[in-house]
Amino acid sequence: MPFLELDTNLPANRVPAGLEKRLCAAAASILGKPADRVNVTVRPGLAMALSGSTEPCAQLSISSIGVVGTAEDNRSHSAHFFEFLTKELALGQDRILIRFFPLESWQIGKIGTVMTFL
């Protein structure tokens, strides 16, 4: 069950319509998870600085069980997400940062229990 949070200082009118759905589909493909398990939040218009600059930028946080736990996996994931984000947001790679957070099944609650028991 991946969780993706895309924060950007781009104003909402510069974020392509439907980005959350395309990011959901891309994440499902990149991470090898069913799209109906992917959760995406897009937050435009934030006060942000990346590398000391307030020029347009974005930060993607990816949390998931089992697929973001190794440097090798994340190197591959990073390449694919950078390709997606540079196209969608028209930002250079130096203006995007990705953070990976491995989760355990007991850290996600769903339908009154945690994923461990589902």
From Swiss-Prot:
A Gene Ontology BP annotation from the UniProt entry: positive regulation of tumor necrosis factor production
Localization per record? Cytoplasm
| Substrates-to-products reaction catalysed | D-dopachrome + H(+) = 5,6-dihydroxyindole + CO2
Pfam families reported for this sequence: MIF
Q: Which EC numbers characterise this protein's activity in its record?
A: 4.1.1.84
Q: List the disulfide bonds.
A: none
Q: Name one GO cellular component term.
A: extracellular exosome
Indicate where this protein is primarily found: cytoplasm
Reported tissue expression: Highly expressed in the liver and at lower levels in the heart, lung and pancreas.
Keywords, in A-Z order:
Acetylation, Cytoplasm, Lyase, Melanin biosynthesis
What InterPro entries does the entry give? Macrophage_inhib_fac (IPR001398), Macrophage_inhib_fac_CS (IPR019829), Tautomerase/MIF_sf (IPR014347)
Record keyword Cytoplasm present: yes
Q: GO molecular-function annotation terms?
A: cytokine receptor binding; D-dopachrome decarboxylase activity; dopachrome isomerase activity; phenylpyruvate tautomerase activity
Which residues are annotated as modified residue N6-acetyllysine in the UniProt record? Answer: K33
Top-level lineage group: Eukaryota
Q: Report the enzyme's class at the first EC level.
A: lyase
Which function does this protein serve? Tautomerization of D-dopachrome with decarboxylation to give 5,6-dihydroxyindole (DHI).
Family classification: Belongs to the MIF family.
Assembly and oligomerization: Homotrimer.
Name of the protein this chain belongs to: D-dopachrome decarboxylase
